[in-house]
């Protein structure tokens, strides 16, 4: 699919996605998706990424988030989507891959747009700027907040950093996610670690 440049086409597709997620997601998740769309638009303007693509992916990124567990397993099996051992245990991670496949079939999303949806759950060393924007927008959209004062402070700092250095924002978001996952006794996906290490390695090389 060609880059989204036609404003009317973009609005029509945004309306279609909006109608779909209204039906398929809870009100809270729907509001989050709209928030991610707005934050993705903001970051796309800063980093000179196709704004239409950022908005479309931001709105659609969680389209498979609330699919029942059994349905997720059935979907990846029927569509022959490869999943790893951690994804088999932590079913929540599958909504990225499933969402990417849904958006390819329903909305004819480009490969880059699909990858941005797939990678938003764990990160990926091969993320391009669109994927990084969606990853960070998911963590920093204005509707997100924490009752814990320290976590809220970290969120505000991440929002500020995201407008200056998107790579640093991705790395910090992954760091915080790893710490939180360890505290909860959860499994850490290797893609997150690989992404963090790549970003840090690039930073050290340029120092």
Predicted segment positions?
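Generic N-terminal amphipathic, Lys/Arg-enriched alpha-helix
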Residues: 1-5, 9-25
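Active-site hotspot residues in diverse enzymes, especially metal/ion-binding acidic/histidine motifs
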Residues: 39
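Charged phosphate-binding loop/patch that engages nucleotide di/tri-phosphates or the phosphate backbone
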Residues: 176-207
